[in-house]
Amino acid sequence: MSETILVTGSSRGIGKAIALRLAQSGFDIVVHCRSRIEEAEEVAQSIRELGRQARVLQFDVSHRNETAEKLLADVESHGAYYGVVLNAGLTRDNAFPALTDEDWDVVLRTNLDGFYNVLHPIMMPMIRRRKAGRIVCITSVSGLIGNRGQVNYSASKAGIIGAAKALAVELAKRKITVNCVAPGLID
């Protein structure tokens, strides 16, 4: 039986590239999208053409209950995930004095709360597998050094980095690793 990896935000961009690369490496993939279902289905089809299994889950990672319901139903139907790539995220860039409450809230809810909302419901099923597992958080250089016009985004990514470090300590004895990848600007 092949191991399955959930890749959030994998209908396009970095997430799509990660999902395809993991499929090429022999993993089955759960393709996730918030709204781009057609693009997510195309990614899933590309994965199937590589000889791997793929399915699509659609939910907004900033909505805790919806995220938990979708993930728990998927785990119930298909079993616990071997790994998760937390890639879903967004930016709402603006100089801090011009940053709106909504700009702050939506970025923190999606990026930082999304970490909790995705991982919390699937953590015990991953632990109960009693096998090694992997969690990779796609963060940003902005979470390490900050970036002009991205106070909200930098705060969210720095929060993920801190949470990932703490979770890595918690899960180390269970052979589940937690790491962050912090890219710079992406084309």
Residue ranges and their predicted role:
Residues A95-F96, T100-L108:
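Substrate-binding pocket helix/loop in short-chain dehydrogenase/reductase
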Residues L119, S156, A164:
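Active-site helix of classical SDR
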Residues S140:
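Residue(s) in the substrate-gating loop at a strand-loop-helix junction
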Residues M124, V169-K173:
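Alpha-helical segment proximal to the catalytic Tyr-Lys
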Residues S11-R12:
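Conserved glycine-rich cofactor-binding loop
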